């Protein structure tokens, strides 16, 4: 388990559902990869959820006989979950968060059709440049971890 695994059992203070996520993000189907965001009291920790149904187009080619969620799609899920979560902060009203860079990413386990991806998020530094640490979990445990950077613009 990763350092943010405690969030998997943490009581959720507020759930952000799809209509509010769509207000926070410019993404739309078929490229919206966050179903729900969970907020925990303080603005430091958050969680994004995404269920992979197996009907996503990328499974047809990655891989036809053994479908696996591509690692870049897991990173995109992380980025979208972060964007949707941090934009719930009232201090950021009227601003936008843009995914800027990946400091590192490590892929530990596969994510398969039917898996519920739980993305645990920690804000390491907030401001114009916001630094995030994220861990993605499925029922099999920690599958991906990454440090991501975002720029907040007016």
Residue ranges and their predicted role:
Residues 37, 102-141:
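Hydrophobic beta-sheet segments that form the core/acyl-binding groove
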Residues 37, 69-92:
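Active-site helix/loop of acyl-thioester processing domains in fatty-acid/polyketide metabolism
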Residues 69, 138-154:
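Flexible glycine-rich active-site/ligand-binding loops centered on an Asp-His dyad
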């Amino acid at each position: 388990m990763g350092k943010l695994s405690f969030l998997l059992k943490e009581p959720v203070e507020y759930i952000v559902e799809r209509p509010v996520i769509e207000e926070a993000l410019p993404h739309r189907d078929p490229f919206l990869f966050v179903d729900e965001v969970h907020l925990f009291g303080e603005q430091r920790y958050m969680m994004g959820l995404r269920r992979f149904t197996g009907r996503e187009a990328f499974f047809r080619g990655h891989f036809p006989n053994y479908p696996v969620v591509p690692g870049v799609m897991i990173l995109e899920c992380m980025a979208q979950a972060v964007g949707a979560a941090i934009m719930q902060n009232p201090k950021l009203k009227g601003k936008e968060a843009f995914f800027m860079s990946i400091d590192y990413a490590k892929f530990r386990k596969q994510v398969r059709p039917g898996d519920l991806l739980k993305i645990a998020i920690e804000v390491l530094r907030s401001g114009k440049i916001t630094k995030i640490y994220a861990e993605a979990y499925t029922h099999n445990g920690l599958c991906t971890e990454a440090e991501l950077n975002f720029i907040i613009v007016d």
